[in-house]
Amino acid sequence: MRISTPFAAAALGLLALAGASHAQDAAAPVRGYSLPLVDLAADTARQVIVDREPGQYLGHPTTVLLEDGRTIVAVYPKGHGRGPIVMKRSTDGGRTWSERLPTPPNWETSLEVPTIYRVADAKGTKRLIMFSGLYPVRLAVSEDDGASWSGLAPIGNFGGIVAMASLVPLRTGAGHYMALFHDDGRFIAERAAEGPRRFTVYKTISTDGGLSWGPPEVVVSHPVAHLCEPGAVRSPDGKQIAVLLRENSRKLNAFVIFSNDEGRTWTAPRELPGALTGDRHVAKYAPDGRIFVTFRDMALESATKGDWVAWVGTYDDIVNGREGQYRVRLMDNHNPWDCAYPGLELLPDGTFVTTTYGYWEPGAEPYNVSVRLTMAELDRLAAAARRF
C-alpha cells in the first residue's frame, strides 16, 4: 500500500516505543491507534522470496515447523483462495526454499485457502494434516512429515470459508483438537441458505488425532458485525483460549471472544482496540512471554491500512482491551487490501519466520515472501523512535 500523505509519511518512519502498554476504554475502542510503529518494509535483508511466477497470482500461505526446529512446510493456492495447491519446503529455517514439490492430483481441485497443521493421536503417532474449504471441507494427511500425502477427502457433510483458520490442541484428552472456521451461509450446507448472509464462526472437534471430525457447532455470531477468520491463542497458564476475529462489514473494529472450558462455552464478543483490527490474525508467544500477532491491517484509521503488519503486546493487553506495546509494518502492499494471510513460526533461536502473499511490486501479481525478525531487534528499533 503506497502512503503519500504528510501524516502517513511521518507515521511510517521508525516511530515510538513508550515502554508500557497503552490503555484504552474497552467499552468504546478508538478506530485508530496511538502505538509506536516500527517500519520494516524497506529492510529487504529480512525478506526471502518463497515463490514467484510472472503473471500468476500466488496467494494465502500457511506453514508448519517440524520438530527439528528448521524444517518448514508451506502450502498455498495458485489463485485467490481457489486454485491448485502448491507445496514447498525449507530445511534451513526459511532462509531458502525448495522447488515446488509433487502433490496428489486432486489437490488441483482445491476451492479455498489450504491450511496445514501438526497433530498427534493418543498413541503419539504424529501426522501433518491439510484442510481445504468451501463445500465440503476436505482433508489430506501425511504420515511422513510431508514427504507423501493422501488426496483431499471430505471430513463431513458441511463446508466453510478459510477452513480451518485455527487448530487448538485441547486438554480434554490426548489427540483431541478443536478446529475453527467460519461461513456466511453459502457453504455450511450443500444448498446455500436463502436470505441475507449471516457470518457465523464454527468449531469442529477431533478425538483421534485429527483424522476424523465431528459436525460443526456454532461458536459465535453477531447481529451487526461480520465475524470471521478466527485466530486462537491460549493464555500463558493455558487455562483460557482467546480468539481474535476479523470484522468483515468494515464498520467496527476486530473482535475477541474467550473460553474458560476448552471451547464448550464462550464469552460475548467485544471489540478490540484499533491496534489489533485487521484480518486473519495469527499469534505466537515470543520467548519472553509477549505475543507476536501478524495480520492484514484493516484498522479504520491507519496509515498502514491494507499492509502486512504485526502487533506486539501481552495476553493481558488482549484481555483488558489495551492497545499493546507497538506495531510493526512488515511489508508495503501495493493494493488497498489483498495481502497477509500469514504463516508464523518461532525457531529455537528466538527468530520469528512469518510468510505471506501480497502485491509487493507495483503492477506485478502477488507472490509469497518470508520476513525474519527477533523481538530484541524490534525492541531496539522501537526504542530509538518517538511515539506516534
What are these regions (language model features)?
Residues 1-5:
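Positively charged n-region of N-terminal signal peptides that target proteins for export
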Residues 8-18:
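Bacterial N-terminal signal peptides
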Residues 20-22:
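Sec/Tat signal peptide C-region and signal peptidase I cleavage site
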Residues 24-388:
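Asp-box/BNR beta-propeller blade signature and adjacent active/binding-site loops
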